[in-house]
Amino acid sequence: GILADDMGLGKTLQMLTFLLSEKEEGKTGDELRTLIVTPASLVYNWKKEIGQFVPELSCKVITGNAAERQEMIQNEEDRDIWITSYDLLKRDIACYENIRFANQVIDEAQYIKNHGTQAAKSVRLIQSGFRMALTGTPMENRLSELWSIFDFLMPGFLYGYQGFREKFEEAIMNDRDEEVSARLRSMVHPFILRRLKKDVLTELPDKIEKTVTIELEGEQRKLYDA
């Protein structure tokens, strides 16, 4: 499913708590092995939070040069959680060919919103049982972004992309078809867990949003149109 809580509501900690519960139920080795794929800037944040909140879970960061990473990947029995970045997963994907993970987590899942990118293709190639996507923005601009995440989670659930376009995207985006939109919501709703700050932090004042429209000028317009 998609854990889509607002930023700051603890998606990382919720995921780690789930993995700890799996270990406490007696799962080890192949039954527990988890691959976490995250932007490079967050790799060591995951490692830090594992050590701080769930030290019972062992982890390793796939890092180093190509040969060092290959050796770490081939030594598959030594840690509960493996952490790598989207970029390194693309480079190392062949090394994962014969490895199966019980769980696969993709953080900042908007990184795979374009289903044709190498990042999106790589996470799909990993052999894994339970899959989870973490993102506060499962869809930013186009319905195809939502399809791409679901195609990672449950391939075929929203059909192939061409089928999705014909059954949902064109009717919703071009015709504003409310019936089709409601049907899509009913399909994806059970698999999206989302809390907003306003729902859980009642002591905070409401956020005030103001939209200001401005015109792009000069170099800004040239860069935007490029």
Predicted features and spans:
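ASCE P-loop NTPase motor core, strongest for the SF2 helicase catalytic module
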Residues: 1-176, 185-226
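Long, charge-dense, solvent-exposed interaction surfaces that engage phosphate-rich ligands
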Residues: 181-183
